[in-house]
A protein has these predicted regions:
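Small-residue-rich helix-loop
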Residues: 1-115
């Protein structure tokens, strides 16, 4: 399924992408010539951006971007596992209480980083 881009900022209810589609895009970006700049533009968990106050035990082990609109929230990017494996992580919630998913997502990031 192709993503639908409305205004380029991601702040439109007319824009859409599936979790699978976003994951594929992140995998493709990893092998792209612009990968270093792309990844460095993403906040580091526990260090900067909207995840600087994350309670993750693995601060510094992930480059993740958050996004939210009323009744929806998302988290996507790359997590470095303890084994040296790098993982693509995508989480999306579309619900009136979508922000409540953040606690579970913190646990998901920690679990992934521990792998």
């Amino acid at each position: 399924e192709q993503p639908v881009v409305d205004n380029g900022a991601g702040l439109s209810r007319n824009a859409s992408i599936t979790a699978s589609g976003l994951g594929q895009m992140l995998q493709n970006a990893w092998v792209s010539p612009v990968m270093p700049e792309f990844v460095s533009s993403m906040p580091i968990v526990g260090v900067d951006g909207t995840l600087r106050r994350s309670k993750s035990r693995f601060a510094g082990a992930a480059h993740l971007k958050t996004g939210s609109l009323r009744d929806s929230a998302a988290l996507a990017g790359y997590v470095d596992g303890a084994s040296g494996q790098r993982y693509v992580l995508v989480a999306m919630a579309n619900h009136a209480n979508a922000a409540a998913a953040r606690t579970a997502w913190d646990a998901l990031v920690d679990w992934t980083a521990a792998q």
